Regions:
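Charged, low-complexity interaction regions that mediate assembly/partner binding
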Residues: 16-77, 363-496
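Mg2+/Mn2+-dependent nuclease catalytic core
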Residues: 77-107, 251-357
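A non-catalytic, helix-rich entry segment at domain boundaries
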Residues: 51-56, 180-256, 433, 442
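Charged, glycine-rich intrinsically disordered N-terminal tails and low-complexity linkers that flank
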Residues: 87-89, 95-212
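Conserved ASCE P-loop ATPase motor domains encompassing nucleic-acid-directed helicases/translocases
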Residues: 51-120, 431-568
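Extended, Lys/Arg-rich, non-catalytic nucleic-acid recognition/anchoring regions
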Residues: 246, 316-318, 324, 329-395, ...
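Long, charged low-complexity segments
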Residues: 3-17
């Protein structure tokens, strides 16, 4: 215990533990404690004070970092005026020790979300989570993919960004498996495999035609054999496993590919399958699980487990669902294996610390806008840095290391002028991305994707960035070829119909938007399921929204519930 927490045992704590062990042995073997040992044992027990008793608890606080010392972070709240900085206790064992690296990277005026905050009688804050720059949303899948076989360094995130996306068989197989799941979930009877494959060819014609692997006869045959295997396994899972005792999965009340924006944790993501009441969800994987960790047993890979944990955390902090009551499953369609995920909040804290380190790197690059600094950061993308677990041997040298070395080899082959151009372009894109997410601090008002939750409803209405209190006139969300909704605008509550025309929206045909159900003033994109789409057409009487994904469960978008949509500026 002392080694794990990197603490040296004090004499009184050591004697306390010795006393506990001595009395345990006495009870177990019914033998008296030796006299010389008994005289050394304390008469009263010392206790570890992990954190002072809580006077009150706060679910979430947004604060601005000022400075720190060895014990406290000194912060000011954003929603009220404080005469003195608040003191935040950090690096507390078993509470928030996972954020030690985050606290080392903080800069003056950095914004933090403090979650699950315990406030003692002296007013000191002890949060369970410290989220750096929460307005900068990271994609859950991209963050989880930082967990590799060889380690989880933040540079893995930037390596994935700089590597080209290959149109390979595994990616195609995953897309087709998602199509199979959609078909089996909404099928009333049997599903024809050949019809599904024809639909796959209509949906992914370019990808299938351009896939280099499918030009090889043997690989092509294996690919379509795999498609049939995954089709059969998904059928078995939906028709049989869903109804097995303990799973409580009802395909008739399911939502496919729901999206969530979690400002609390600085994350966004999209699930494969979820019950409409959010009691259960499934993340599907068409690739291999870990077949070698335990002999004769298939275990989920670490990156997949991380992804599940983050979804559980998002449902808790965005939707108010207790993670202990949400059943999360990983579906490996290759076996098939429907694996129940077990929540570990300590692991979630470690992943959020990794997220914070990535955001700090992004902030540093866009702030300095320096070719030398960017070159230094990208120099971290090398095997000696990323191989945190010290792997060696044939698997590392043949399959893992080449993809890392390939980046540095290509970078080193550039001329000095080409490198300067690359670093300058990288800086430009990073700054634009940062601004598009978090907004421009020099701009009056809220900008970027963060304005979705930072701007008030009145501010959005004034700038024409939202249209709300819409009604669904026609629901064609299940249309395979053109999933869309026809919305009818009406006057906002409390506004006479003749004055509704005074509200001028700032929307045009083709604009990317995010749609969500809005039944009260408290509803927004951070606490409701969101649907992404584009404006197909709009006029004074109706608005047509083209959805990015079909949604065959009509109860997800009820016709009697008002909806709102606002501009979507998230990179997607």
């Amino acid at each position: 215990v002392y080694k794990r927490q990197q603490q040296e045992p004090t004499r009184e704590h050591l004697l306390r533990d010795a006393k506990t062990l001595a009395f345990f042995i006495r009870k177990l073997f019914e033998e008296d404690i030796p006299q010389e040992l008994y005289q050394l044992l304390p008469r009263t027990d010392a206790t570890y004070i992990v954190a002072p008793p809580a006077h009150k608890r706060v679910q979430r606080m947004r604060v601005c970092f000022q400075y720190s010392d060895e014990q406290y972070l000194y912060v000011t709240p954003l929603d009220e005026i404080a005469d003195e900085p608040l003191r935040v206790r950090y690096n507390i064992p078993q509470i928030n020790e996972e954020f030690a690296e985050t606290c080392r990277l903080l800069w003056r005026h950095a914004q933090l979300n403090l979650l699950d905050v315990s406030v003692d009688e002296a007013g000191f804050l002890t949060p369970s989570f410290i989220v750096l720059e929460p307005d900068y949303l990271l994609d859950i899948s991209s963050l989880a993919e930082c967990y590799r076989d060889y380690g989880h360094h933040p540079a893995n995130y930037f390596l994935s960004r700089l590597q080209p996306i290959e149109n390979a068989r595994p990616l195609l197989l995953g897309n087709i498996a998602n199509l199979f799941l959609d078909e089996w979930i909404h099928a009333e009877g049997e599903v024809d495999y050949l019809k599904c494959m024809r639909k796959a060819f209509r949906r992914y014609p370019i990808e299938l035609a351009a896939c280099a692997d499918l030009r090889d006869r043997e690989k092509e045959r294996q690919f379509f054999d795999d498609c049939k295997l995954h089709f059969d396994h998904i059928r078995e899972t939906v028709n049989d496993t869903f109804h097995a005792a303990g799973y409580e999965l009802d395909k008739t009340d399911a939502v496919l590919e729901p999206s969530y924006i979690c400002e609390a944790l600085g994350l966004q993501g999209r699930l494969d399958y979820m019950q409409r009441d959010m009691s259960s969800f499934i993340e599907m994987k068409s690739g291999k699980a870990d077949e070698y960790a335990i002999r004769g047993k298939v275990e989920p890979k670490e990156n997949n487990k991380v992804q599940m944990l983050l979804y559980q955390a998002v449902l808790q902090y965005s939707m108010g669902m207790d993670h202990r009551k949400v059943k999360a499953y990983l579906l490996y369609t290759r076996y098939p294996l429907l694996y129940p995920s077990r929540p570990s909040w300590a692991m979630v804290r470690r992943v959020i610390d990794l997220r914070n380190r990535i955001v700090a790197d992004e902030y540093g690059v866009q702030l300095r806008n320096s070719l030398e600094y960017t070159a230094q950061k990208l120099e971290e993308i090398k095997a000696s840095v990323l191989n945190e677990r010290g792997l060696s041997g044939r698997f590392w040298e043949t399959y893992l290391r080449p993809s890392i070395d390939n980046f540095q080899e290509k970078l080193s082959s550039l001329s000095s002028l080409e490198k300067s151009y690359f670093y300058a372009l990288y800086n430009f894109i990073t700054k634009e991305l940062y601004t598009s997410k978090s907004g421009d601090v020099d701009y009056e008002g809220c900008t970027g994707a963060a304005s979705l939750w930072l701007s008030t409803l009145a501010e959005k209405c004034e700038s024409g960035e939202i249209i709300y209190d819409l009604r669904i006139k026609e629901n064609h969300a299940a249309d395979e070829h053109k999933a869309h909704l026809l919305l009818v605008p009406s006057a906002p509550p409390g506004m006479p119909a003749e004055d509704a025309s005074d509200v001028l929206p700032n929307f045009r045909q083709g604009d990317a938007i995010v749609l969500y159900e809005r039944n009260s003033d408290a509803d927004n994109v951070t606490n409701k399921m969101v649907f992404k789409g584009n404006i197909d057409f709009l006029n004074e009487n109706e608005i047509c929204i083209r959805l990015r994904a079909t949604q065959q469960n009509s109860s997800v978008l009820p016709s009697d519930s008002p909806v709102s949509y606002t501009h979507l500026t998230l990179p997607t």
